[in-house]
């Protein structure tokens, strides 16, 4: 075996061993110590992160991709399933980022969840999730990818419903798992199609043997899977609802790692779809619709976590647009930069929520810049990175995506929607900063404001550094697989920046108008549309079940009762027998002439029958 391959497979084995060790210690019947989460879990993830840097440096030095197949799981005459790992730039870059972000979030969770009696179990769930995510990222066949896919799904369900005493948390967890189940149908059907038509689940073999086939059907299944997992329009309501879980869960699963699994699936299998115009157009239009719709919903939300959740969904839509543009590497770059600042925004939100007695309404915050200067500064940095401010992390990916979109010869409507959503990103980001950091405090004086704990400061600080320099580091060290546009007109080059600045100006105007409005709640249709999330949950979660119940009630009470019990049952017997009864009773009238006539007729009939 080549030494590079040996080192890569050994490091992955070490990462899995380090992450599994804390889980194995929990099998001991004696209960864990109070600080087990910090001594075992956090240390294991930190060590795994440091180990994962080794393959990254080797890859930077040599630039070689490696596939390691070490164990045959199952085989038949035409089909085999191996344990196979793929070390390409997607898995080698994303694994350290996932470990780094998780390390920061778990340290924050040790402060955020310190009063929870089951904190050790919470950390165990997060660790299981991380293992499933790394399996998904490094998988080289659909079977392993499916194991990781379902693993992150079930851990998401358990962690959203962590506070299971609350009805909202249970509903949100069920909602998440049902929407994901719809997406999983697409993935399972695609896997079945690949197994029956290509006789292989190995990704390289699938690429090689599918060149002559029409892949529209399985690609639509994969897009459905990505729509469910990455909260694209139609299957998006679960992501804002998932904010019922603890803030560390929102920061890890529902912003930086799990929700990008759907996009990652499409990036990993992109060679299948790069020449299929139907699939690419579907991705482009679906992504553009998602990014604008969810950005519109974020404009009027007042729950700080919901705003950040909708911004996540909006950025996932932008990644889907990028896949539709045939630029998977740019989508992956945006995944990497987005992980840092979005996780940091959630941690800053969690810190502020905790400091204000669990208050999540931004209208009841304000003036936090003087009270929690570090957290507020990082919240501002994260918001600026999200809007694509030049030379922060988000700029390098977002600007490249908008450039690729501007210079492509594709759907102009998708371009318009995406640029409008980019402008809205600036609006809701500045709105959060305005309501949370600026102005005067609008909360009770008894709020226990405290940001002196290193478990709060250090994770946010690490992610802040990532939000500032990650984009520069990644773009300066990796060559793009497709040559970017070298020259373009100045207006096109500045398009992303101009719409962002216009969004910031609109946000400032709106924020100042907020203090001058006469009615507390606007009655505009547009405001209601945005605030009610486009009436989507009301229609899908309320109207559809109501119509189903009404239909069921109609079938049960009217169709079954009236048809079976009345028309066919007792009343039916009466209605069928009544004509015969009336006919026979009319015949028996006591008239001798009639009887005599009938007697002669019947006698004559009998004689005729005997004669013939």
From Swiss-Prot:
Function field: Core subunit of the mitochondrial membrane respiratory chain NADH dehydrogenase (Complex I) that is believed to belong to the minimal assembly required for catalysis. Complex I functions in the transfer of electrons from NADH to the respiratory chain. The immediate electron acceptor for the enzyme is believed to be ubiquinone.
UniProt GO cellular component terms: mitochondrial inner membrane
Family per record: Belongs to the complex I subunit 5 family.
Catalytic class of the enzyme: translocase
Superkingdom per UniProt: Eukaryota
Keywords linked to the UniProt accession: Electron transport, Membrane, Mitochondrion, Mitochondrion inner membrane, NAD, Respiratory chain, Translocase, Transmembrane, Transmembrane helix, Transport, Ubiquinone
Protein name per UniProt: NADH-ubiquinone oxidoreductase chain 5
Membrane topology: Multi-pass membrane protein
GO biological process: ATP synthesis coupled electron transport; electron transport coupled proton transport
Keyword NAD belongs to the record: yes
Lineage: Eukaryota, Metazoa, Chordata, Craniata, Vertebrata
């Amino acid at each position: 075996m080549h030494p590079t391959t040996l080192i890569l497979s050994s490091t992955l084995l070490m990462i899995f061993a380090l992450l599994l060790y804390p889980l194995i210690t929990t099998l001991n019947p004696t209960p864990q110590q109070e600080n087990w989460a910090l001594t075992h879990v956090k240390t294991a993830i930190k060590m795994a992160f440091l180990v994962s840097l080794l393959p990254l440096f080797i890859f930077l030095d040599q630039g070689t991709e490696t596939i390691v197949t070490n164990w045959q799981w199952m085989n038949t005459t035409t089909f085999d399933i191996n344990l196979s790992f793929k070390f390409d730039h997607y898995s080698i870059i994303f694994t350290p980022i996932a470990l780094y972000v998780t390390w920061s979030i778990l340290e924050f969770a040790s402060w955020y969840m310190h009063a929870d009696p089951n904190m050790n179990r919470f950390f165990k769930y997060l660790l299981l999730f991380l293992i499933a995510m790394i399996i998904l990222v490094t998988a080289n066949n659909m079977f392993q990818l499916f194991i990781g896919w379902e693993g992150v799904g079930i851990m998401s369900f358990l962690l959203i419903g962590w506070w299971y005493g609350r009805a909202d948390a249970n509903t949100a967890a069920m909602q998440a798992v049902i929407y994901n189940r719809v997406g999983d149908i697409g993935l399972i059907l695609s896997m079945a199609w690949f197994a029956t038509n290509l006789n292989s689940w190995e990704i390289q073999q699938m690429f090689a043997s599918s060149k002559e086939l029409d892949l529209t059907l399985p690609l639509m299944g994969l897009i459905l899977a990505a729509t469910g997992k990455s909260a694209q329009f139609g299957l998006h309501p679960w992501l804002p609802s998932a904010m019922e879980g603890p803030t560390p869960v929102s920061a890890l699963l529902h912003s930086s790692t799990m929700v990008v699994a759907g996009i990652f699936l499409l990036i990993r299998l992109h060679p299948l779809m790069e020449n299929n115009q139907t699939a690419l157009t579907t991705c482009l239009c679906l992504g553009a619709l998602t990014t604008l719709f969810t950005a519109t919903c974020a404009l009027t939300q007042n729950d700080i976590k919901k705003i950040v959740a909708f911004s996540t969904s909006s950025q996932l839509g932008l990644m889907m647009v990028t896949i539709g543009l045939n630029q998977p590497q740019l989508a992956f770059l945006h995944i990497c930069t987005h992980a840092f600042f979005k996780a940091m925004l959630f941690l800053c939100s969690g810190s502020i929520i905790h400091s204000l007695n669990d208050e999540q309404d931004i209208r009841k915050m304000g003036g936090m810049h003087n009270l929690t200067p570090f957290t507020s500064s990082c919240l501002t940095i994260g918001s600026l990175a999200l809007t694509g401010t030049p030379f922060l992390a988000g700029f390098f990916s977002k600007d490249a995506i908008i450039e690729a979109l501007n210079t492509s010869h594709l759907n102009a409507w998708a371009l318009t929607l995406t640029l409008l959503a980019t402008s809205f990103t600036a609006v809701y980001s500045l709105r959060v900063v305005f309501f949370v950091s600026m102005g005067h405090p609008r909360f009770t004086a008894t709020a226990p404001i405290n940001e002196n704990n290193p478990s709060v400061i250090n994770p946010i600080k690490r992610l802040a550094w990532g939000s500032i320099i990650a984009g520069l580091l990644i773009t300066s060290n990796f060559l793009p697989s497709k040559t970017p546009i070298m020259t373009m007109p100045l207006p096109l080059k500045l398009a992303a920046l101009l719409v962002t600045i216009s969004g910031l100006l609109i946000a400032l105007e709106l924020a100042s108008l907020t203090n001058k409005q006469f009615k507390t709640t606007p009655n505009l249709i547009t405001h209601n549309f945005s605030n009610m999330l486009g009436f989507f949950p009301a229609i899908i979660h309320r109207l559809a079940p109501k119509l189903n119940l009404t239909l069921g009630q109609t079938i049960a009470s009217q169709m079954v009762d009236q048809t079976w019990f009345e028309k066919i049952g007792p009343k039916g017997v009466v209605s069928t027998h009544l004509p015969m009864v009336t006919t026979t009773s009319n015949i028996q009238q006591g008239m001798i002439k009639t009887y005599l006539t009938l007697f002669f007729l019947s006698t004559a009939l009998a004689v005729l029958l005997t004669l013939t």
